[in-house]
UniProtKB/Swiss-Prot annotation:
The active site is at S294, D391, H425. Keywords: Cell wall, Hydrolase, Lipid metabolism, Repeat, Secreted, Serine esterase. Pfam families: Esterase (PF00756), LysM (PF01476). It is an enzyme of class 3 (hydrolase). This is Esterase Rv1288. Its EC number is 3.1.1.-.
Amino acid sequence: MVSTHAVVAGETLSALALRFYGDAELYRLIAAASGIADPDVVNVGQRLIMPDFTRYTVVAGDTLSALALRFYGDAELNWLIAAASGIADPDVVNVGQRLIMPDFTRYTVVAGDTLSALAARFYGDASLYPLIAAVNGIADPGVIDVGQVLVIFIGRSDGFGLRIVDRNENDPRLWYYRFQTSAIGWNPGVNVLLPDDYRTSGRTYPVLYLFHGGGTDQDFRTFDFLGIRDLTAGKPIIIVMPDGGHAGWYSNPVSSFVGPRNWETFHIAQLLPWIEANFRTYAEYDGRAVAGFSMGGFGALKYAAKYYGHFASASSHSGPASLRRDFGLVVHWANLSSAVLDLGGGTVYGAPLWDQARVSADNPVERIDSYRNKRIFLVAGTSPDPANWFDSVNETQVLAGQREFRERLSNAGIPHESHEVPGGHVFRPDMFRLDLDGIVARLRPASIGAAAERAD
């Protein structure tokens, strides 16, 4: 949700811009978002909007109208770029000039809307409705028309135990955040991949939480390296790709000797509500899916069962689904890998004695009833490389565990989609495309207006 501020004695817009953005020149952005005609005059108690923004460098051929059309879908919003950037004549920009592109959504009024209700929804305070009226040139805040398009400023802010310590929202689709959180002893990163039309559509979207696998080369950037932008082009869904540790196993571990590594808390109790408070997503069962590769595929199945009301679809791409088979091979691997890579000798499930209740709570084959009324999608390889012990052991175990899981689902009368395909322990883009189509079909479709239950 966008940040707001109430002016106190002695404050100026320049001083506030320096405090909030680290740049006093951004006072114009605050003025534009808050409907202030004279930036030199603010009053004690006056409420201000502190929106997010993107810096843009003008290239040959650019005009403010063309940039407004590209960023916002409406050329006539060039005046907002001009106001935020301190440009007196919107028809004149120079190559190399740095522009401030305010971050806002275009909201289409539906029956029953009021400015005070929209202020409560977007700004967290119904009394801020005059700011929406001022920016949109509405003389009578008590009168708005169905179909009227409003400019409403947005932004990402701290909350739910997360403090933003780094961010980059300059890419048209892929936005990056890094958080400080007491759940993790270091600052985990998250990539959020937006639909092509997120900036301009005003729609609310379903969301997919996509989890990476284990290993020292795996983190929140993994799927970007694997081509996730192309794989999701044109799809009306938000993709959230968080850090999960090199061997975090999407769990709060039994023990850690390097500080907190509570990935389950970070993902479920902190990141999920933060996403829903800061992006236009559906905060409901039918608005969320979870998927992952390898360790992340296990995490997807685990979260879908353990947090039954959170996710309507769960997908495991070469992820283990049975923890206890073959004398608990997956549990032993989770304990060993987490001890070496993440926990300084601590373990996810306990060693030498396991926390048996925790294993059962996390074990997909022991949680079969928790997959009812969900879309389940499974992928496993049938021909791992025999010369590569890691590939062979991994995918052989994955295949056997998924077969056990599928049999139990079938015996319980729970529908599921499964694919056994040639190859070993690798991410398969063609299977992800197929999966994504099914996810989009299962979840609540993107929509505008009253259907949007949560927004920026």
